[in-house]
Amino acid sequence: MLKLENLSVEVAGKRILEDVNLEIPKGEVHVLFGPNGSGKTSLIMAILGFSSYRIVSGKIWFNEIDITRMPINERVKLGIGVAFQTPPVIRGVKLGDIIRIFIGNGTNAGQRQRELTKTLNIPSEFLSRDLNLGFSGGELKRSEILQVLAQKPGFIMLDEPDSGVDVENLELVGKILDNFLKGRSGLLITHLGYILRYVDADKAHVLLDKTIGCSGKTTEILSHILKEGYKWCEKCPTLRKRRYERRISQQL
């Protein structure tokens, strides 16, 4: 469904991702680990097509369509959705207006909105607030998840859904996401993996030193990270090989 081929990305002339290869088949949810500042959010921005994230080389494929140079709105139309870690504040735009746009004007639109807000424990008055203005950490997460659920994308990217959230909201959001992701495809980004207490991921990857250093079973990789931190990933033969190949190519 989503395939990245040797993707290299720059921001303001600085290389932030290099030769990233990743493939997420239809119906699978993958998790991407990585230390702070490793480029996890940058990868999401590049996949979405934000212009400041310039693709230097490589390809992005979605459902066998080359979307490398496609505008953001066209990618969204194809079914790519995202829940940001730190969404922007938009004054004058009500959360409820955004949700109504996503849901549409069908005969069951009102009922669906009520069902979604009830599922996320969102009071009706919350919808009348300016988008993300003065929202707490838990409110931001629920607002982002509400928007994603309203859009019903075929492929969803979740940027640190477990950051800045208390235990109660984490459990609520986690269980809702796990149910929503059944039968869908997605990329879940996390630093410490708390969200994985509630969400099942088919495969895990580690982003380190601008590239994906290793991939494998989610439980195994998470266990290593929790025990040894990301120092464990430095021992990965795949990462060492890629670093060696990079040094050789730079010398040529």
Model-identified regions with their sequence ranges:
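Walker B catalytic motif
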Residues: 160-161
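Q-loop/switch helix immediately C-terminal to the Walker
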Residues: 85-86, 92-109
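Conserved structural motif at the start of ABC-family nucleotide-binding domains
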Residues: 2-4, 17-19
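The feature captures the beta-strand-to-loop junction immediately N-terminal to the Walker
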Residues: 33-38
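ABC ATPase NBD coupling module
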Residues: 54-55, 66-81, 180, 225
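Helix-to-loop junction immediately C-terminal to a conserved catalytic motif
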Residues: 48
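Conserved beta-strand-loop-alpha-helix hinge in the C-terminal portion
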Residues: 211-234
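ABC ATPase C-loop
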Residues: 148-149
